[in-house]
Each structure stands twice: as structure tokens, then as C-alpha cells.
Curated annotation (Swiss-Prot):
Protein name in UniProt: Thymidylate kinase
Function: Phosphorylation of dTMP to form dTDP in both de novo and salvage pathways of dTTP synthesis.
Family affiliation: Belongs to the thymidylate kinase family.
Gene Ontology biological process terms, A to Z: dTDP biosynthetic process; dTTP biosynthetic process; dUDP biosynthetic process
SUPFAM superfamilies on file: P-loop containing nucleoside triphosphate hydrolases (SSF52540)
EC numbers, comma separated: 2.7.4.9
Underlying gene: tmk
Residue positions binding ATP: 10-17
The UniProt record lists the keyword Cytoplasm: no
GO molecular function, one term: ATP binding
CDD domains according to UniProt: TMPK (cd01672)
Keywords on record: ATP-binding, Kinase, Nucleotide biosynthesis, Nucleotide-binding, Transferase
GO CC annotations, alphabetized: cytosol
Catalytic activity of the protein: dTMP + ATP = dTDP + ADP
Amino acid sequence: MRGKFITFEGIDGAGKSTHIGAVAARLRERKDIPAVVTTREPGGTPLGEDLRQILLHRKMHLETEALLMFAARREHIAEVIEPALARGDWVISDRFTDATFAYQGGGRGLATSRLETLETWVQDGLQPDLTLLFDVPLETASERLAGAREPDKFEAESRAFFERTRAEYLRRAAQAPERFRVIDATQSIEAIRVELEKIISTL
């Protein structure tokens, strides 16, 4: 039986990464799941991690940025995601294609049609079974990021950029309610954990 593919999404500072390990641990307790693979985008492969460093720290044309995102994604799908799903393993990814539509599309203003063309080519129909969107007001996200490590290129973007990015995430969630679950990430860590367990138990 083919495995399940779960993605975690949200703007920087939403707190999604805090919960990935806990969800993976809970799923690993289940006897019906051979293994759980946790990964991230951009990244997930040696080439993908190299591209991640370029994407997070180098200035480039917005179309170049999108192309590199999808190049890293193609390698990720071919080398990690598809083989794991074919084995029956479950895959949890910290970001996937929705992030590209939100950041490069919503945030940067790249035409959705161009991103959709790349998505069709690179993914060949692959979509997550479940996308958990961690949503927070920009003020909350900014407070969480303040005083953290040196911000990368995206974390240092303007408030307007993140307003557009968040709006695009929510728009996509509204368009695909069967796949998305929007999490109020202003809740306590414990409240979010309980909510996530309820959602995961339905898979």
C-alpha cells in the first residue's frame, strides 16, 4: 500500500517546525506504518541542501529563484519522496509546493500560471494527502523571529511581503479544503499538539 504524504506550511515565525518531530513520533507508534520519513524544502537531498543555501542567502531574479526551487523539488521527489511513498512509508515535509506559490507567487508576484506549469512538469500529479497550514498574524510571527539567529533572505523581507504571502496561503487553503487543515498557531504548543493528534488520527 502506498504511503501518505503530509506537508507543513506557514510563513516564517508561524511555529510549524516545532511540531514536526512530535507528529512524526506519534505516527511511528502506529503499527500500520512501516516507517516515517521527515524532510524539508528546499533541501532533503545533498543537491537540494546545496541549492537551499543559494536560495536562502543569494540575491537573484525572481524567476531564477522559482526555477531553483522546482529544481530542488524535482530531485527531492525523485530521490526521497516517491521512493518512500512507493515503499509504503509516510513522508512529512517541512514545506512543499504551496510555499512556492505563497512566497514566489504571493510574496514576489510571479505569475501563478508560470508556477503551475512548473508544478505540472516537476510533480507529474504528485500532491500531498494532507497539508497543515500554521497561520498566525504577522505581529506574532515577527515577535517569534525577533532576537533569533541572523535572518535569511526570506525572513528579512518586508511586512508587505509577508502579508501577501500569508494571504496566498489562506487563498490556497480555501480553494482546497479537502487537503488543507488551517491551524490557529497562536494557541499554546499543547493545544496545537492535541489538535494535530486529532487530525492525524483520521488518516
